[in-house]
A protein has these predicted regions:
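Active-site His/Glu-centered metal-binding helix of metallohydrolases
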Residues: 435-436
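Alpha-helical transmembrane segments and their membrane-interface boundaries
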Residues: 255-405, 409-423, 427-431, 440, ...
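Hydrophobic packing positions in regular secondary-structure scaffolds
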Residues: 1-266
Length: 453
């Protein structure tokens, strides 16, 4: 058992013991002494009754610290264990973007009730955040940031930072606005601290800044933050007024979420599915992909059926053709994975990246030759037929070239038409390498059949 798993088990056991013993003071101290992330992970293993008891003996501040680090499923379970008034009290210790995420997961009726119970200014901010889809810049932004007028002196800006800084998640980047409230640039906290206190904020403002609109997809926002190494990126409307900011910790969550989603979708599994998903839901989520795979499997089967007569005369073909198609599938997956990753971080332009396409073809020739020769030697030893070995080499080269071509083009074409390459690429690439791999190998065998018998 790894040290990390052992630590998780110890946290879970200790947390459960304190809850069962109703040790409120010890539990509160435990939360303060440990990273809230570790506490949230331990809380995932609690049943609903234990979670309710945990909420009943903890202060709203302690629950808030755990809620901010909890995953979506645990947050939903927490809301079931808390009354509306208890939630409102907890929200007073949480960031607005986290509050919006939690409220967004509530039933419509309860969501309206809680929003209506909020103070006017909080209600306005949360309502604005809830307007945007969860996977957009507006959906993940926070309205807690520091904006300072350009006509204020640096010393006045410092006073404002001292006043509201403790409530703000990111204070390293200060946003500078004009008299109309429009964003005109940013200022680093380091520059503010080291500058003459009597100069204007406008004098230390960097006007070359990156901003995004509230409708931008969270994955595109993550690319910008990564590309320009930002700690926070402002979200602005058409008038360049700041609506909020997306912080780097939210971007990390986005990257993890998108990575997990891509891994699941490449396997034909929906991001909505988990171990707790009901049997009926799992069937609905998985069956469509399995049916698509069934169709592609029949395509490969029909290709083999065309050459049934050839296979009947040279039985060895049946064992070798699976090697050819399998190697093609693996090679195609390699190229496809590289392209999907490249598309996720930067757009791929065939006119610009044609050299990479040619490289994949040559790579298919070289890898096909090496693997084909190794396979051919084994085939010749086993079946004592040199011509069968030669056909194996040619087919291996051909199928790995096919794998390189389709592994490159399929993700690019899918992305061009607005489809997610991570979801559908593998089906088309595997189908191509299976069907064409069988066709090349069995077609050659049919042509040179007299030499194989």
């Amino acid at each position: 058992m790894s040290e990390e798993i052992l630590k998780e088990n110890m946290n879970e056991e200790r947390l459960r013991h304190m809850i069962e013993a109703s040790e409120a003071a010890e539990l509160s101290e435990y939360i303060k002494e440990n990273n809230p992330i570790d506490v949230a992970q331990a809380a995932e293993y609690l049943d609903d009754e234990e979670l309710w008891k945990m909420c009943s003996i903890l202060s709203s501040e302690d629950i808030a610290s755990v809620l901010e680090q909890a995953d979506d499923d645990l947050r939903v379970r927490f809301t079931y264990a808390l009354s509306n008034n208890e939630l409102l009290e907890i929200f007073s210790s949480m960031a607005q973007d986290d509050i919006a995420d939690i409220i967004g997961d509530l039933t419509i009726g309860r969501r309206k009730t809680i929003v209506n119970l909020m103070k006017d200014n909080d209600r306005t901010e949360i309502t604005n955040l809830l307007e945007y889809p969860a996977d957009t810049a507006g959906g993940i932004m926070t309205t807690a940031y520091i904006a300072i007028r350009e006509d204020l002196k640096v010393i006045e800006g410092l006073e404002k930072i001292r006043e509201i800084g403790p409530k703000i998640e990111v204070i390293e980047t200060i946003f500078v606005v004009n008299a109309r409230g429009q964003l005109i640039g940013t200022a680093d906290l380091r520059d503010i601290l080291s500058s003459d206190k009597n100069i204007l904020m406008a004098d230390i403002t960097k006007e070359n800044f990156i901003s995004v609109g509230p409708e931008m997809d969270q994955e595109e926002v993550a690319k910008l933050v990564s590309k320009y190494d930002l700690k926070a990126i402002p979200v602005v409307n058409q008038r360049m007024a700041i609506l909020g900011i997306v912080t780097v910790d939210d971007i990390i969550d986005v990257i993890v979420e998108e990575y997990n989603e891509d891994i699941l979708e490449m396997g034909g599994v929906s991001k909505e599915e988990s171990l707790d998903t009901t049997l009926l839901q799992s069937i609905k989520l998985r069956l469509p992909w399995l049916l698509i795979n069934l169709i592609t499997a029949f395509m490969a089967s029909f290709t083999v059926k065309v050459f049934e007569g050839t296979i009947a005369q040279v039985v060895a073909l049946s064992s070798i053709m699976t090697i050819i198609s399998g190697m093609g599938g693996n090679a195609g997956s390699q190229t496809q994975s590289i392209l999907v990753r490249q598309i996720a971080t930067d757009k791929v332009d065939f006119k610009r990246d044609w050299k990479s396409f040619v490289k994949e073809i040559f790579l298919g020739v070289i890898n096909g030759t090496v693997n084909g020769l190794i396979t051919a030697i084994i085939v010749i030893i086993l079946y004592r037929n040199v011509f069968l070995g030669v056909i194996t080499v040619i087919a291996m080269i051909g199928n790995l070239v096919v794998a390189g071509i389709f592994g490159f083009l399929v993700p690019v074409i899918l992305d061009k038409f607005g489809a997610d390459p991570a979801v559908s690429s593998s089906i088309f690439v595997t189908t191509a390498t299976d069907v064409l791999g069988f066709f090349i190998f069995l077609g050659l065998a049919n042509i040179f059949l007299p030499m194989l018998i």
